[in-house]
Each structure stands twice: as C-alpha cells, then as structure tokens.
UniProtKB/Swiss-Prot annotation:
Signal peptide: none annotated. SUPFAM superfamilies: DHS-like NAD/FAD-binding domain. Part of a complex that catalyzes the reversible cleavage of acetyl-CoA, allowing autotrophic growth from CO(2). The alpha-epsilon subcomponent functions as a carbon monoxide dehydrogenase. The precise role of the epsilon subunit is unclear; it may have a stabilizing role within the alpha(2)epsilon(2) component and/or be involved in electron transfer to FAD during a potential FAD-mediated CO oxidation. It holds the Pfam family CO_dh. It comes from Methanocaldococcus jannaschii (strain ATCC 43067 / DSM 2661 / JAL-1 / JCM 10045 / NBRC 100440). GO terms for biological process: methanogenesis, from acetate. Belongs to the CdhB family. This is Acetyl-CoA decarbonylase/synthase complex subunit epsilon. Heterotetramer of two alpha and two epsilon subunits. The ACDS complex is made up of alpha, epsilon, beta, gamma and delta subunits with a probable stoichiometry of (alpha(2)epsilon(2))(4)-beta(8)-(gamma(1)delta(1))(8). It comes from the Archaea.
Length: 146
C-alpha cells in the first residue's frame, strides 16, 4: 500500500470509515459550494505555509479561528457541532489532537470536515494524502489558482 494514504500515526484512525483522499481542485470546489465555510488554524505552520494560508483565507473570505490562541480545540469542536457552519477546514493542528477532535465532529454533527494539512488525517471526511514539504506547498498553491 502507498504510504501516502495511511495515517501518519497509524493508531490515529478511530474506525473503518477513514477519510477520502482529496485534491486541491476538489477542495476548491467544496469551499466555493459551501454556504458557510470556516478554517480552523493551528500554530504548527512554517512561515511560507502561513503566507499561502493567509492568501487562501483572503481569496475565499474564510472565517478563521486560531487554536489555541483564540479558542481551545475541543471548545471549537463543540461550537462547530451546534453551529450552522457546513464546511470546516483544518491545518496546522497537532496531529493527534486533531484526530480526536475530528472524531467528535464525525460522530456528532453534519459538518463536512477537510484536513488540508501535509499529513493524511483519517478522522476527517476528506484529507490531503501524506505530502513532502514541497508537495504540500504545491497543493496550497493549487488551491489559490483560478
């Protein structure tokens, strides 16, 4: 099996319903179709990644919550589960924290979850595959095209 499509931390997958691998093109379409998308932004991003994510926020006019700076991740999950957001994007969050938090959303809400991080996240509904730093930057650039 291709290592790009297995969990970065193999024990992070909580059940048999693992995330579908997605591409920047599909993520772009999902963001455009969403009525109320939100980006949950962690602190584990390098400077060049932050720059591209900032452009993404601006391009798609995404509401953003920074964790842990503005709100605790579990509080964000509870907030999203009871809110009217229909699409939640995640990036820069510590891998195993997001694995647990995304499980909460998967079980207790109708929010479509997408990990746009460089590591495959099995507990979201959609995820980028495991990517090298350069591939990840390329995926982010493709999100900004068009």
């Amino acid at each position: 099996m291709d290592e790009r499509f297995i969990a970065y931390i193999p024990t992070a997958g909580s059940n048999v319903a693992h995330a579908e691998i997605t591409s920047p093109t599909l993520v772009k379409m999902m963001i455009r179709r969403a009525k109320k998308p939100i980006l949950i932004l962690g602190e584990n991003l390098e400077e060049n990644e932050k720059e591209l994510i900032s452009k993404l926020i601006e391009k798609f006019n995404l509401k953003t919550i920074k964790t842990p700076e503005e709100m605790n991740l579990m509080a964000i999950m509870k907030y999203l589960a009871s809110s009217d957001y229909d699409l939640a994007l995640f990036t820069g969050i510590t891998y195993y924290y997001l694995a647990q938090a995304a499980t909460h959303l998967k079980q207790f809400s109708n929010v479509v979850t997408i990990s746009i991080d460089k590591y495959y996240q099995p507990n979201t509904l959609y995820s980028f595959p495991n990517l090298s730093k350069e591939e990840y930057l390329d995926y982010l650039r493709k999100l900004l095209e068009g």
